[in-house]
């Protein structure tokens, strides 16, 4: 009985260690940088330029026509992207003219994007949310999206417009700042044809 109990405890400890190792591996996924259009490395000034760039870390991907980085250490750094910038995550995406992406502890932590306008989209099981603004600040760790400047957000049959909207992707909560807000409730789709009248008895 004691031996059997000891084996169960040992198995539980091994399973817990394996789960912890798996979580650690996810946090330490490698970041791959590909420059299809070439590079320009100025080592004397620590400026690195990439053309036709794609950065991938697991299911997170960034593509742009150009990128500039002050150093290649992406454990804790900031990169500037410009030209047809697209940032895709497992359940969301951003598109913009320019972007500043921050790397923290070896992973992408946030993205500040600007455009005319910049756009955002989140996919959920049976619906989606999308928005646009002059600037969008996306915090991957907190799961928040700040739409700043002519902000518009569509979610769950509602359209919200305002100067600044803060959207939480985890609980679908919207907070407005810096001025009035207009909310438009969209009706359900009308039937394409009128129902047939019931036959008279």
Region annotations inferred by a language model:
Residues 1-201:
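Mature-chain termini and adjacent capping regions
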């Amino acid at each position: 009985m004691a031996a059997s109990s000891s084996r169960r405890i040992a198995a539980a400890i091994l399973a817990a260690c394996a789960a912890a190792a798996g979580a650690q591996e996810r946090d330490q996924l490698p970041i791959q940088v590909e420059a299809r259009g070439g590079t320009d490395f100025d080592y004397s000034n620590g400026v690195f330029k990439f053309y036709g760039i794609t950065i991938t870390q697991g299911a997170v991907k960034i593509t742009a026509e150009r990128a500039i980085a002050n150093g290649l250490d992406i454990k804790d750094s900031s990169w500037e992207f410009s030209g047809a910038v697209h940032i895709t995550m497992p359940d969301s995406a951003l598109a913009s003219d320019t972007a500043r992406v921050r790397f923290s502890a070896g992973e992408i932590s946030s993205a500040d994007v600007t455009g005319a306008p910049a756009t955002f989209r989140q996919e959920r099981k049976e619906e989606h949310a999308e928005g646009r603004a002059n600037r969008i600040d996306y915090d991957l760790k907190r799961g928040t999206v700040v739409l700043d400047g002519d902000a518009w957000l569509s979610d769950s049959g509602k359209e919200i417009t305002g100067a600044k909207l803060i959207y939480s992707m985890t609980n679908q909560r919207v907070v407005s700042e810096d001025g009035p807000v207009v909310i438009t409730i969209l009706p359900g789709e009308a039937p394409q044809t009128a129902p047939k009248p019931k036959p008279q008895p």
